């Protein structure tokens, strides 16, 4: 999978019923985040935290959906553990992928993987630790891949969403460590002539190729 490609569509069972992925996304943004196996410690903390901050994603018109290489029944049992240990049960669907179809479709597992998922260990599925941000156009905007031992920073994913949505709308780029409200950079695809029309007050330019303006509202 590469940034800019169309996210593969699929049908799958989830903890909230069967979905067709592209139809489920609709006109929203979406985050698909995957897990190597149910009842694993790091992922338990992640699923609980995503439930806690889901209102922040909803405020940004972003739907979130999990995936784990187990059955929907296992997911529902796991959800009880998540609520009891993290204080928040998943309030978003989790895809059941016991036949590895979605994991293989997205290149998270080799095409020749087969067999009973219950006989596989988390280490067997170690590559299923990805985050995909998908736009309303169904294109992949961002991919993050984490090792099993490092919990994902979903506050950072919120920051990334803010940057992706801002830059998609205004033809700007966000500099290092940017946060909402900070100055931004006029995209290189915008000529100086066009930039003068967009930013009649001008811009700061420590170099001709670094054109800094306040964040567009």
Describe each region flagged by the PLM.
Residues 1-217:
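Chalcogenol-based redox active-site neighborhoods
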């Amino acid at each position: 999978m590469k940034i800019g490609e169309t996210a593969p569509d699929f049908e799958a069972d989830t903890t909230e019923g069967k979905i067709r992925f592209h139809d489920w996304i609709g006109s929203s943004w979406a985050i698909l985040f995957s897990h190597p196996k149910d009842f694993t410690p790091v992922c338990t903390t992640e699923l609980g935290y995503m439930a806690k901050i889901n209102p922040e994603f909803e405020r940004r018109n972003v739907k979130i959906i999990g995936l784990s290489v187990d059955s929907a029944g296992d997911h529902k049992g796991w959800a009880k553990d998540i609520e009891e240990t993290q204080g928040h049960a998943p309030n978003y669907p989790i895809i059941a992928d016991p036949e590895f179809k979605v994991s293989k479709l997205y290149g998270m597992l080799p095409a020749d993987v087969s067999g009973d998922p219950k006989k596989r260990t988390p280490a067997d599925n170690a590559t299923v630790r990805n985050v995909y941000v998908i736009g309303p156009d169904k294109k992949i905007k961002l991919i993050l891949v984490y090792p099993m031992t490092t919990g994902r920073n979903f506050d950072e994913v919120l920051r990334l969403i803010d940057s992706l949505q801002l830059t998609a709308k205004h033809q700007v780029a966000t500099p290092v460590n940017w946060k909402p409200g900070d100055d931004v950079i006029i995209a290189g695809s915008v000529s100086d002539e066009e930039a003068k029309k967009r930013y009649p007050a001008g811009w700061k330019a420590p170099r001709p190729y670094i054109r800094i303006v306040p964040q567009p509202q």
